[in-house]
């Protein structure tokens, strides 16, 4: 169902916010779906107005002490009919039992958690964009209107 949607919202808090931006960019580049990356705390400041039945909402989440707020935001999207895709560690997945689809990443209980989690989550983000694009029939090897390099003049 995600592959036929016209839009998608991608959310995350703190260190994973750049991953939400990159995940949304990959969806745009190869599947031609309008997607936006947002910090989870910003959802009520506009993006929630776009959520309706079957709109995919993707969240990257790790158990870092702030996950309850993010899961609450995700629950609000779910209550408005969004299709929830959660890429998270087991602790977060266990708390968000309402998610339609989950991808579990390894958990880290050390000082490297914030550094390693974005690396692990980038793989499912890229695979999601790839499979959505393939489902839509787009050419993932030669996306339209993209240049391999940017020249600054």
Stretch-by-stretch model annotation:
Residues 46-56:
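Active-site-proximal loop->helix
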Residues 14, 99-153:
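Short alpha-helices
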Residues 6, 31, 53, 80, ...:
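Short, structured coil segments at secondary-structure junctions
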Residues 60-108, 128, 136:
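Glycine-rich phosphate-binding loops that contact phosphosugars or nucleotide phosphates
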Residues 35-45:
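A general structural motif
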Residues 14-16, 70:
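Long, compositionally biased charged/polar accessory segments in the mid-to-C-terminal portions
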Residues 1-7, 11:
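Single conserved hydrophobic/aromatic residue that forms the stacking wall/gate
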